[in-house]
């Protein structure tokens, strides 16, 4: 009976409305999320500019253009190092190079080519082709 009462509460116009009756996230929520992401990006860039010297910043910018994923990993490593107190003063270009090499070594996938030569039962080494 309770289910029937719930169905009777729907008006016939609700079917015609279709998807418009489903609550949609407001534009304010999207704007708020975008603003929050922008604020986080600004804070991250501010921290990185305090961590790196000019030459290292230029190198990181070049890396971000060429390989954005790797640049994000290096930025995350820099921020973690700064939060842990592992950095003393601004990191130089040489220090950033070393960090980039460590990140590359950790993420480098070993690629190998493997030849699988399977022999047919029809083709035997014992037979001679004449």
Curated annotation (Swiss-Prot):
InterPro entries: PDCD5-like, PDCD5-like_sf. Residues 27-51 form a coiled coil. It comes from the Eukaryota. Signal peptide: none annotated. Residues 1-46, 103-130 are annotated as: Disordered. One of its GO terms (molecular function) is DNA binding. Residues 1-27, 36-46 have a biased composition (Polar residues). Transmembrane segments: none annotated. GO terms for cellular component: cytosol; nucleus. Keywords: Coiled coil. Disulfide bonds: none annotated. Belongs to the PDCD5 family. This is Uncharacterized protein D2005.3. It comes from Caenorhabditis elegans.
């Amino acid at each position: 009976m309770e289910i029937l009462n719930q169905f009777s509460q729907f008006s016939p116009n609700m079917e015609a409305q279709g998807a418009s009756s489903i609550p949609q996230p407001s534009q304010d929520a999207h704007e708020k999320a975008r603003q929050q992401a922008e604020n986080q990006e600004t804070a991250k860039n501010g921290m990185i500019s305090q961590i790196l010297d000019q030459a290292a910043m230029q190198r990181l910018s070049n890396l971000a253009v060429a390989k954005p994923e790797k640049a994000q990993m290096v930025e995350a490593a820099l921020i973690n190092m700064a939060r842990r107190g592992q950095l003393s003063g601004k990191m130089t270009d040489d220090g950033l190079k070393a960090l980039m090499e460590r990140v590359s070594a950790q993420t480098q996938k070993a690629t190998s080519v493997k030849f699988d030569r399977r022999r047919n039962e029809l083709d035997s080494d014992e037979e001679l082709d004449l």
